[in-house]
Amino acid sequence: MEPNIIVRIADSGDTVYAETITNEMASSAQARGTGIARRSPDYVSQKIQEGKAVIAVTATGEWVGFCYIEAWQHGQFVANSGLIVAPAYRKTGIAKKIKHTIFQLSRDKYPNSKLFGLTTGLAVMKINSELGYEPVTYSELTDDEEFWAGCKSCVNYDILMSKDRKNCMCTAMLYEPKQETNKQESVGEVSSKNEAPNLFMKMDISKFLSWFRKK
């Protein structure tokens, strides 16, 4: 990432970038030929004022990138939405830095919520995987009607509805905060019951990880 770029939680002064952000979201989706749930400058400004957005700017105040938080089903599900980077700053690591920052902000604000995303971008999928997201079926996402209504402005909305919201062009990914804790508890239970099988399991996993790193 370029040293003169600042990635931080957005504040009320950043609402001046709202129209630039939404215009770039729309033009980027059009250039890729993919769909996107469109957001208005007012909506983006609201997220900024609520402290639920991360922005990247240069030291001179030039807008570089953006992402915001949405919560559904009374905070049971949280999405990091609208990730966008200005064309001149793409492939510089900015998107990854923004995603990591918005992910941590989401975990701080909603520590017990499931984080999910719908995306057609391979780069976003890769970053999500690094953060602990896993591909899931649409049935594992929120059933909040307001969330799905946001897809109406997407060019692929007819495809989504023709499949009863069970599938579309986007890949669904989910991060469950308690997943790692549950895995650790399960290993502990096996250990207390039978040390030998657990030792074999650890050795087997170790060999697998060693093989995986060589790939």
Describe every region a protein language model picked out.
Residues M1-P3, R107-N112, F116-K215:
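Terminal substrate-recognition subdomain of acyl/acetyltransferases
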Residues N4-T20:
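A short beta-loop-alpha structural element at the N-terminal edge
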Residues A10, L83-V85, G121:
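Hydrophobic adenine-recognition pocket in adenosine-nucleotide-binding enzymes
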Residues G13, R39, T119-T120:
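Short beta->alpha linker loops
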Residues Y17-I21, Y43, T101:
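Alpha-helical elements of Rossmann-like donor-binding domains used by nucleotide-donor carbohydrate transfer enzymes
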Residues T22-P87:
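A conserved beta-strand-loop-helix scaffold within acyl/acetyltransferase catalytic domains
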Residues V85, K91-S106, L115-G117:
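Conserved acetyl-CoA-binding loop-helix of GNAT-fold acetyltransferases
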